[in-house]
């Protein structure tokens, strides 16, 4: 699985600039900003939750709420979408957290949460999971990624000589609970490429999400790939 060409979309400065503009737009026009990959991608995630929420996750309690982490949350739209149907989509009690390495993104998400009166139901925090291990404890039941692995894959940075997308895979594995699920949506990698990358690094495939397929010059493909992984229980013994 080769890397992607380096791009400005893989830099923190690019996303800081994007979200600083969106903060201004929200303040002036109540414009919540772009829905990354479109609302159709979010509806596929909602459908996946409807199909799997009752069979794939543990029992929850007040002492041990269901924990959802959205990596690269941006304007927080995905978590807001889940909250719109929280009674049917999510176990109760539930803790929703969105993190992003752009402080401007977190400002925007918090502003939107207040506007929608969701501030008491979701938490947003500035965090670079590549460089900060604050959330790297194995207690997240559901980790969501909608475009974050894509953006990281466009970075030319290295950490200890490793591409950041390789470090990212390890970070996610370190945050996921033993029976938790990592659900990733990508527009840059195929299902096969994602499966190859993650199953070589301690994951097994839980399920895939059907997406529209197009055909061009005899080849078939899709605009996005959506796949769910769990931790391979035998990984540390290999």
From Swiss-Prot:
Q: What's a single GO BP term from this record? A: regulation of cytoplasmic translation
EC nos: 2.1.1.-
Reply yes or no: does the keyword Acetylation apply.
Answer: no
Quote any Pfam family the record assigns. Answer: Methyltransf_31
What does the UniProt keyword field contain? Cytoplasm, Methyltransferase, Nucleus, S-adenosyl-L-methionine, Transferase, Transport
Mostly located where? cytoplasm
Q: Where in the cell is it found?
A: Cytoplasm; Nucleus
Q: Which domain of life is it from?
A: Eukaryota
Q: Which GO terms describe its molecular function?
A: protein-lysine N-methyltransferase activity
Q: Mention any one GO cellular component term assigned to this protein in its UniProt record.
A: cytosol
Quote the InterPro entries the UniProt record gives: Efm4/METTL10, Methyltranfer_dom, SAM-dependent_MTases_sf
Signal peptide start and end residues = none
Q: Any idea what job this protein has?
A: S-adenosyl-L-methionine-dependent protein-lysine N-methyltransferase that mono- and dimethylates elongation factor 1-alpha at 'Lys-316'. May play a role in intracellular transport.
| Protein family | Belongs to the class I-like SAM-binding methyltransferase superfamily. EFM4 family.
Protein name per UniProt: Protein-lysine N-methyltransferase efm4
Q: Whose protein is this, by species? A: Schizosaccharomyces pombe (strain 972 / ATCC 24843)
Taxonomy, top ranks, is: Eukaryota, Fungi, Dikarya, Ascomycota, Taphrinomycotina
